[in-house]
Amino acid sequence: MTSVDFSKGLVPTIILDDQNGDVLMLAYMNEESYQKTLETGYTWFFSRSRNELWNKGATSGHTQKVKQIWTDCDNDTLLIRVTQIGPACHTGKKSCFFNLIKEDF
């Protein structure tokens, strides 16, 4: 199994909908949240603002069941495909990426 490079403390973690490949959110994992994700099969992240671990959906019920975990070529960024239950964004939107800045370049 490929190891993840946590030498900088946190790794950006991109969450994709396993059904359609849509980007749902970006969060950060530290080594402990990564291990909890591997152990439970559900996403755990590290909150930079609260300085603590959080289990996605533990309060809202909008959980993310892990289907696949990928790493980039440097092993310092993760991409996780999930089965999303309910919206991924705390605003109630399906994805955290709903603010279009510009298109038609």
Swiss-Prot record:
Needed co-factor(s): Mg(2+); Zn(2+)
Protein's GO biological process: L-histidine biosynthetic process
Compartments, as annotated in UniProt: Cytoplasm
InterPro entries the record matches: PRA-CH, PRib_AMP_CycHydrolase_dom, PRib_AMP_CycHydrolase_sf
Cofactor: record remark: Binds 1 Mg(2+) ion per subunit.
UniProt GO cellular component terms: cytoplasm
Record carries keyword Nucleotide-binding: no
Gene Ontology MF terms in the entry: magnesium ion binding; phosphoribosyl-AMP cyclohydrolase activity; zinc ion binding
EC code(s) of this entry: 3.5.4.19
Functional pathway: Amino-acid biosynthesis; L-histidine biosynthesis; L-histidine from 5-phospho-alpha-D-ribose 1-diphosphate: step 3/9
Similarity section: Belongs to the PRA-CH family.
Reported function: Catalyzes the hydrolysis of the adenine ring of phosphoribosyl-AMP.
Protein name from the UniProt record: Phosphoribosyl-AMP cyclohydrolase
Source species of the chain: Listeria monocytogenes serotype 4b (strain CLIP80459)
Species lineage: Bacteria, Bacillati, Bacillota, Bacilli, Bacillales
